[in-house]
A protein has these predicted regions:
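Pair of pore-lining "gating" transmembrane helices in MFS-fold secondary transporters
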Residues: 11-31, 109, 211-228
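Helix-loop-helix hairpin linking two adjacent transmembrane segments in secondary transporters
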Residues: 103, 140-187
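Residue-level signature of mid-helix packing/kink "hotspots" within the transmembrane helices
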Residues: 30, 58-66, 116, 149-150, ...
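Helix-to-loop junctions at the C-terminal end of transmembrane segments
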Residues: 65-76, 264-277
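Extracytoplasmic
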Residues: 13, 17-47, 65, 118, ...
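Conserved MFS/SLC helix-loop-helix module at the cytosolic interface between two early adjacent transmembrane helices
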Residues: 63-101
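Cytoplasmic helix-loop-helix junction between adjacent transmembrane helices
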Residues: 107-144
Length: 279
């Protein structure tokens, strides 16, 4: 089966599977953030050591986007998604078994890199979508991805508080393994779009960076936002635990604070004018 053979009905439910895959994979980056005090107590970590866990996870994600995503143009995306899902599931399981900071940090870095599976899924959705429905299908997958980000901290905080942080990672490993298997079964093979070697692919990215100023501005802006966002979440759970004696469930509850961000899209266009401060 090839991507061009998908009917509108088939594409619809496959896109739904891809949305689940994007959500579960990207959630792997954020599970640790509410669990840091639990990890610290269990592994006897300092505050600095706890902060390095989400930092290296995010760094791994950035490295994966830079060095692994270009492979999607040269290799079958179905195979890449399978390989990354297997690696991600194994790394999540390994994280649940770790007993010292050094191994936890290495595994966290690799989890971030493998979680770029989510970014392989998004272009796959665009390729599979029937003509004229690319925007809707990609939007569905992006909704799954954003829900994974939004709900991951809340889920991990509650699960960690009730069952412990290791159980959360074991459950995450199972979820990624299952959705990876389903995607392997339902996805068609994807055509290779480039015959460039890996060094040539990387060089082409440098060319794009130099040629498009808008791309540079967008990348730098999003990078700065990501750093600020990660700095907040890398310290929130620790601060809540040390100063307010609040557990991981409360820290995870902050994860749903972004939900009201979708409300303004449903409000009348005149409301922002009425709500604007008078100067």
């Amino acid at each position: 089966m090839t991507p061009t053979s998908l009917s509108t009905r088939d594409a619809g439910w496959i896109i739904f599977i891809l949305a689940l895959g994007a959500g579960f994979s990207v959630a792997s980056i954020y599970y640790a953030q509410p669990l840091l005090p639990l990890m610290g107590a269990n592994l006897h970590l300092t505050v600095e050591g706890m902060g390095l866990v989400p930092t290296l996870t995010q760094a791994g994600y950035a490295l994966g986007i830079l060095f692994l995503l270009p492979l999607g143009d040269r290799h079958d995306r179905r195979r890449l998604i399978l390989v990354k899902s297997v690696l991600l599931a194994l790394l999540l399981l390994l994280c649940s078994l770790t007993g010292q900071l050094s191994s936890l940090l290495v595994v966290s870095l690799l989890i971030g890199m493998a979680a770029t599976m989510a970014q392989d899924i998004v272009p796959a959705a665009a390729i599979l979508a029937p003509a004229g429905k690319q925007g809707k299908m990609v939007g569905t997958v992006m909704t799954g991805l954003l829900l994974g980000i939004l709900l991951s901290r809340t889920v991990s905080g509650v699960v960690g508080a009730v069952f412990g942080w290791r159980v959360m990672y074991q459950a995450a490993a199972v979820s990624v393994a299952l959705i990876g298997l389903v995607m392997w079964r339902v996805l068609p093979r994807f055509a290779v779009h480039s015959t460039l070697s890996y060094p040539q692919l990387m060089a082409s990215m440098a060319h794009l960076w130099q040629r498009y100023p808008a791309l540079r501005r967008a990348a730098l802006a999003q990078g700065a936002l990501s750093i600020a966002f990660s700095a907040f979440w890398s310290t929130l759970a620790v601060m809540l635990s040390e100063h307010y004696h609040m557990g991981s469930a409360v820290a995870g509850g902050f994860g749903i604070a972004g939900a009201p961000g979708r409300w303004p899209r449903r409000l009348p266009a005149v409301w922002p004018i009425n709500l604007a401060p008078v100067r």
